[in-house]
Amino acid sequence: MKNLAGLMKQASQMQAKMEAAQSNLASLIVDGSAGAGLVTVKLTGKGEMRDLKIDPQLADPSDIETLQDLIVAAYTDAKTKAEAASSEAMRDVTGGLDLPAGLKLPF
């Protein structure tokens, strides 16, 4: 029974750490950019877009495809950084235990 009580205590501590990690990730802002900074995106650590800036020189109606590509590239850059921050936060919570690829708990 002592082991069960210890496990319950550990589970409770891990839950508190996960909640703190989620809160930290929600307030973390990561920047992504493309086109030498002509397009920038800001995402939360949970991947929610908060800002998109486009340099006015890219507003060329005859070349909208380049603008679209740069927006996607900037978003992808920021998303990669947000996922890295999330993975790092989870490693801190799990004590370095690597979770299986694709497992995105609790996010």
Curated annotation (Swiss-Prot):
<comment type="function">
    <text>Binds to DNA and alters its conformation. May be involved in regulation of gene expression, nucleoid organization and DNA protection.</text>
</comment>
<comment type="subunit">
    <text>Homodimer.</text>
</comment>
<dbReference type="GO" id="GO:0005829">
    <property type="term" value="C:cytosol"/>
</dbReference>
<keyword id="KW-0238">DNA-binding</keyword>
<dbReference type="InterPro" id="IPR004401">
    <property type="entry name" value="YbaB/EbfC"/>
</dbReference>
<keyword id="KW-0963">Cytoplasm</keyword>
<comment type="similarity">
    <text>Belongs to the YbaB/EbfC family.</text>
</comment>
<dbReference type="Pfam" id="PF02575">
    <property type="entry name" value="YbaB_DNA_bd"/>
</dbReference>
<dbReference type="GO" id="GO:0043590">
    <property type="term" value="C:bacterial nucleoid"/>
</dbReference>
<dbReference type="InterPro" id="IPR036894">
    <property type="entry name" value="YbaB-like_sf"/>
</dbReference>
<dbReference type="GO" id="GO:0003677">
    <property type="term" value="F:DNA binding"/>
</dbReference>
<protein>
    <recommendedName>
        <fullName>Nucleoid-associated protein GOX0603</fullName>
    </recommendedName>
</protein>
